[in-house]
């Protein structure tokens, strides 16, 4: 894998002249250049550059991508990289991402153009995944370093990393090991080359040695700066998700369009009501429309007063507020059947201000088509002419209004704009009901609903439904019909095992969407050993990816064995073990999540349409977006806008949405945010192409967690 390399030195002036860069740009002391807030990504189609572009997409940071494998692609030259605007030199990109430290052929004019550009304008370069070699500021990995897998290894942010771009992390950077039988990582660990100006930001132990090798570090040379990454990753792996923010902050100097935060919200459905219980003998849920066994007797699961105390104590301990989606009929019926007594409702109402509340309709009725439940699975009932029979507008409106009226009379701190229908009904549900109930949009309008919870597993994209925007919610795979761990595991086994193993065979019939377990889980240990780790990892993955969508569970998960808490604690405790205090979990209510999703979509649309202009000149940042589209920016602490403080603090930076009226917005950076000075003398060193690097199959395609090792 090692290659012998020779270098050739050229004076900066000679190289710039040869490339035809605008006169005077090598000496920027006369007129400070304009640097556009856009990233250039040169891709080889590999997972590392794809991961970085995915992070830029999530944040809303604009970039131009050039795929080296595409015929007829854009040639990288001086004219492509820089020009002059109104007499001022302009750098068209604030940062460059390459697949490695030199992905071009020997003697490449494109690599020379990039090197000259970076030096001239002080533009940083990210080597997304490169071999450890002297040309990247490191000793050759084959000479006392390490080349191989790092599955399960606990890397760490160095002191320099914490003081620099990775100050939002607490220290540990654990590498995934989802399946011991699959290689999910590969890295080249090494130490700085002799005489190299290299600072490691993230490192790991070199196997068999007492020293640690760099995984991410900054190499300063020839008037240029490179972030050298010597391990491969994909956009879903935890090790990348932890470092993604820092990579973007390093390459942009903390000045860029777009922003990300880490969100986590938990909706608890069916509060005040009860949920039907899984029957391990009948393998169905008595009381549910799909359980037609004549011997099926419902055995409901309902919270009690002690569960309320546990929930409020948990909220205080974790710093997260639960959103309770309530059905008032649950307590109305409970009091009617028990001489006015409902200890659960009394406890919840006594602590009502400690929760957020969402209207979940009065009776949890199905609000789509009229269901024919005489068949399994159910189907939509039809009129005499064969058309679908829909739940009427009056019924939908009554469900919404009656529940709201009860909540208001009980003094619940409601947001009347929010609604979650029972089972997300009214909206389309495949295969039985392929379209929305046409009466739903009108009912939403009549009741002032603008934020409507939906099921992310059915419809992951936000959409408009009448006056409302949907808020897709992630279902947590802790079943609504299980109050005890043994019940959860029994139903899990029924769904995910083959018929020959006593299961339903659903996984056999639907291999594209469901994977069969190799064997049934132990009902005593399977929940803690497999289900909790899987659900924790999934939810934590959403959190680490900057996804604001909420997760939903059911009130049955907060009682009896309190099945939800091991998952929720795993997510929040796991998060806090990885992140510094300046990067807390952001816990929004549903309406605010919907607004965040809407703003992101509008911002992405504006970026793709080329409707956003943003650049930096010295310590002034100018951003102009289309009228009515909020502008997203991330800037250093101390930034001001019109003399007032800008944004809110998160992860050591300031970020925020600013409403746009279509005119330029000017922000002033603090004096500490000095742009990297361009080099004006010395030589540039041309290097040979970077050696090939290994990319395991377990990185190309994300490996499912076996959760059993």
Each PLM stretch: what is its role?
Residues 40-128, 133-135:
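Helical hinge/lid and interdomain linker segments adjacent to catalytic or ligand-binding clefts
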């Amino acid at each position: 894998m090692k290659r012998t390399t020779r270098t050739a030195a050229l004076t900066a002036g000679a190289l710039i002249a040869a490339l035809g860069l605008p006169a005077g740009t090598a000496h920027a002391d006369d007129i400070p250049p304009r640097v556009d807030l856009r990233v250039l990504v040169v891709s080889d189609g590999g997972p590392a550059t794809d991961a970085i572009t995915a992070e830029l997409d999530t944040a809303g940071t604009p970039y131009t991508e050039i795929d080296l494998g595409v015929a007829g692609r854009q040639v990288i030259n001086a004219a492509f990289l820089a020009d002059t605007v109104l007499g001022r030199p302009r750098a068209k990109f604030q940062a460059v991402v390459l697949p490695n430290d030199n992905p071009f052929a020997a003697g490449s004019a494109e690599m020379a153009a990039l090197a000259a550009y970076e030096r001239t304008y002080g533009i940083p370069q990210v080597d997304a995944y490169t071999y450890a070699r002297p040309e990247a500021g490191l000793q050759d990995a084959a000479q006392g370093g390490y080349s191989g897998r790092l599955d399960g290894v606990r890397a760490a942010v160095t002191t320099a990393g914490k003081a620099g771009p990775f100050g939002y992390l607490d220290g540990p950077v654990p590498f995934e090991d989802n399946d011991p039988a699959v290689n999910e990582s590969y890295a080249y660990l090494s130490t700085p080359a002799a005489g190299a100006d290299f600072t490691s930001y993230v490192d790991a132990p070199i196997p068999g040695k007492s020293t640690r090798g760099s995984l991410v570090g900054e190499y300063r040379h020839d008037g240029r700066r490179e972030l050298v990454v010597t391990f491969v990753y994909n956009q879903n792996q935890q090790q990348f998700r932890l470092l993604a923010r820092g990579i973007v902050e390093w390459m942009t100097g903390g000045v860029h369009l777009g922003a990300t935060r880490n969100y986590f919200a938990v909706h608890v459905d069916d509060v005040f009501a009860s949920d039907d219980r899984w029957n391990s003998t009948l393998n169905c849920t008595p009381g549910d429309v799909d359980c037609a066994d004549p011997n099926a007797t419902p055995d409901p699961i309902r919270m009690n007063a002690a569960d309320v105390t546990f929930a409020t104590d948990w909220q205080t301990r974790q710093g997260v507020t639960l959103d309770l989606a309530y059905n008032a009929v649950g307590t109305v019926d409970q009091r009617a059947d028990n001489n006015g007594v409902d200890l659960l409702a009394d406890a919840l109402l006594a602590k009502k201000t400690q929760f957020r509340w969402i209207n979940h309709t009065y009776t949890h009725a199905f609000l789509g088509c009229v269901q024919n439940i005489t068949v399994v699975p159910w189907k939509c009932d039809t009129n005499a002419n064969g058309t679908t029979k829909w739940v009427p507008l009056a019924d939908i409106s009554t469900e919404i209004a009656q529940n709201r009226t009860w909540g208001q009379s009980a003094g619940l701190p409601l947001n009347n704009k929010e609604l979650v229908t029972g089972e997300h009904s009214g909206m389309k549900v495949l295969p039985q009901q392929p379209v929305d109930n046409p009466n739903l949009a009108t009912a939403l309008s009549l009741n002032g609903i603008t934020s409507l919870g939906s099921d992310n597993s059915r419809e992951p994209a936000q959409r408009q439904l009448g006056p409302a925007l949907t808020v897709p919610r992630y279902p947590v795979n802790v079943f609504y019909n299980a109050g005890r761990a043994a019940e959860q595991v029994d139903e899990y086994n029924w769904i995910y095992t083959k018929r020959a193993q006593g299961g339903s065979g659903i996984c056999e019939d639907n291999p594209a969407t469901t994977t069969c377990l190799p064997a049934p889980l132990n009902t005593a240990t399977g929940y803690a050993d497999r289900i909790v780790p899987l659900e924790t990892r999934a939810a934590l993955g959403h959190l680490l990816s900057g996804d604001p969508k909420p997760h939903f569970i059911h009130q049955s998960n907060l009682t009896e064995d309190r099945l939800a808490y091991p998952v929720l604690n795993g997510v929040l405790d796991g998060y806090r073990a990885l992140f510094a205090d300046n990067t807390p979990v952001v816990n929004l209510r549903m309406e605010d999540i919907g607004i965040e999703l809407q703003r992101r979509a509008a911002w992405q649309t504006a970026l793709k349409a080329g409707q956003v202009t943003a650049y930096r000149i010295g310590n002034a940042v100018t951003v102009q977006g289309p009228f009515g589209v909020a502008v997203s920016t991330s800037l250093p602490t101390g930034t001001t806008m019109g003399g007032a403080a800008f944004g809110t603090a998160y992860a050591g930076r300031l970020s925020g949405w600013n409403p746009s009226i279509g005119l330029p917005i000017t922000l002033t950076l603090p004096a500490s945010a000095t742009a990297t000075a361009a080099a004006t003398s010395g030589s540039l060193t041309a290097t040979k192409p970077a050696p090939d690097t290994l990319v395991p199959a377990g990185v190309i395609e994300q490996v499912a967690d076996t959760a059993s090792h």
